[in-house]
């Protein structure tokens, strides 16, 4: 198999455009978030059928706390509704749930439902549905570096032992090994920026940007972008 035809092991998606989707329809923003939540189910099942091993979804950033309180409170309820509604299908499709972020800062009910989802799917061996929730890449890297520094301070490791792999092993994605780094990033809604998402892990990631708003992004859109990715020549800095 040629380099360009290798499977897409880790797909990351910045799910953007829920608010604009609602605004275009003269609806409250929370309606867009609700439709966006339902679309997670559609895209997750489609990605699973494509053989993707890890699907990482940027669900809530550490910066999103600055949104209006009513909106934040609604977003904190969505994981409860999502797993209540779709857990049977996740189990049926052998999907394992992982929550990646500073989850100890979540409201108790939200935290408990995420931990329950991980526990209930822990023995599933199919695709990992990895939610980045209360996640920020700069904070993740800072926390990882601080932990390495503590180990150096107490003599657990030598400063010369610090390597790229060691840094990776101290990031929140280490549990996704050997697929910590996304092969492809998709961002919906036409925006073309990373928004503090997986900055270390995406050093060699391919990017695709869709003009579709997240609630409208469907299976066909996903398949087209995956096909485009599979036709690319990933050189990783080589000729």
Swiss-Prot record:
User: What cofactor does this protein call for?
Assistant: Mg(2+)
Query: What cystine linkages occur within this chain?
Result: none
- Which annotated residues bind Mg(2+)? 16, 206
Q: How is the cofactor bound?
A: Binds 2 magnesium ions per subunit.
Per UniProt, which keywords does this protein have? Magnesium, Metal-binding, Transferase
Please give the GO cellular component terms listed in this UniProt entry.
cytosol
Q: Where does substrate bind?
A: 17-21, 29, 33, 61-63, 65, 67, 187, 193-195
> Where is the catalytic site?
16, 64
One GO biological process from the UniProt record?
A: polyprenol biosynthetic process
Q: Name one Pfam family in it.
A: Prenyltransf
Give TM segment ranges.
none
Q: Which InterPro entries match?
A: UPP_synth-like, UPP_synth-like_CS, UPP_synth-like_sf
Which GO molecular function terms does the record list? ditrans,polycis-undecaprenyl-diphosphate synthase [(2E,6E)-farnesyl-diphosphate specific] activity; magnesium ion binding; manganese ion binding
Output the superkingdom of the source species.
Bacteria
Q: Please indicate if the UniProt record lists Methyltransferase as a keyword.
A: no
Q: What is its EC number?
A: 2.5.1.-
PROSITE patterns, sorted: UPP_SYNTHASE
Q: What does this protein do?
A: Catalyzes the condensation of isopentenyl diphosphate (IPP) with allylic pyrophosphates generating different type of terpenoids.
> Record's family?
Belongs to the UPP synthase family.
**PANTHER family reported in the protein's UniProt record:** DEHYDRODOLICHYL DIPHOSPHATE SYNTHASE 2, DEHYDRODOLICHYL DIPHOSPHATE SYNTHASE FAMILY MEMBER
HAMAP family on file: ISPT
Share what the entry says about its subunit structure, partners included: Homodimer.
Task: State the name under which the record lists this protein.
Answer: Isoprenyl transferase
What organism is recorded for this protein? Lactobacillus johnsonii (strain CNCM I-12250 / La1 / NCC 533)
């Amino acid at each position: 198999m040629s380099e360009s035809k290798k499977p897409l092991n880790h797909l990351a998606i910045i799910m953007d455009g829920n608010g604009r989707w609602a605004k275009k329809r003269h609806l409250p923003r929370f309606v867009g978030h609700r439709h966006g939540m339902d679309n997670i189910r559609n895209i997750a099942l489609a990605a699973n059928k494509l053989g993707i091993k890890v699907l990482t979804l940027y669900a809530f950033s550490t910066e999103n706390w600055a949104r209006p309180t009513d909106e934040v409170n609604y977003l904190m309820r969505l994981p409860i509704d999502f797993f209540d509604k779709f857990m049977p299908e996740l189990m049926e499709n052998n999907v394992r749930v992982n929550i990646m972020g500073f989850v100890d800062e979540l409201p108790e009910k939200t935290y408990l439902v995420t931990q329950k989802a991980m526990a209930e799917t822990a023995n599933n061996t199919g695709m990992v549905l990895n939610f980045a929730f209360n996640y920020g890449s700069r904070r993740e890297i800072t926390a990882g570096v601080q932990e390495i520094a503590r180990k150096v301070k107490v003599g657990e490791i030598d400063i010369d032992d610090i390597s790229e792999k060691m840094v990776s092993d101290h990031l929140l994605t280490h549990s996704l090994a050997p697929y910590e780094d996304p092969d492809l990033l998709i961002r919906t809604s036409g925006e073309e920026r990373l928004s503090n998402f997986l900055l270390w892990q995406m050093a060699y990631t391919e990017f695709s940007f869709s003009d579709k708003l997240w609630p409208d992004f469907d299976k066909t859109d996903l398949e087209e972008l995956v096909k485009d990715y599979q036709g690319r020549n990933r050189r990783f800095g080589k000729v």
